[in-house]
Amino acid sequence: MSYVHSLRVRYGECDMQRVVFNANYFVYVDDAVDMWTRHALSDELAKAGSSTDLHAIGFDFMLKTTQLTWHSPVKFGDTLDMHCEVSRWGNSSFDVAINGQVDGDSRFDAVITYVSVDPKSQRPSPIPDIVKEALSK
């Protein structure tokens, strides 16, 4: 499934050149994946009596690695569209590829590796099928 998360770049997220400060790209992609996950799992979360708590469905995930390749700047006032999709499924880890675009022009590519963890022990655990299904639609 490809999910698009959009945001407008605010002044406080930029440096003196009025371009996004480099660390904020990582905040943006993490937020995009969080929004996508909760959107894709919204029916399962509702059945479990929650709208946001992934623990209610027996799932949580933590970042292992992030890689970002910058192509051109994202600037103050731009609307940034982040196209997210799972690019690799493992047993307990998965990769999410994100392409950041402004007006259809690619500004960066990121790949994040996440590890599925048991919410109680926070130890790696197999990715639940409901998560794989939801993020693969």
Predicted regions: what is each one?
Residues M1-D81, S87-K137:
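Terminal targeting signals and extreme-terminal segments of soluble enzymes
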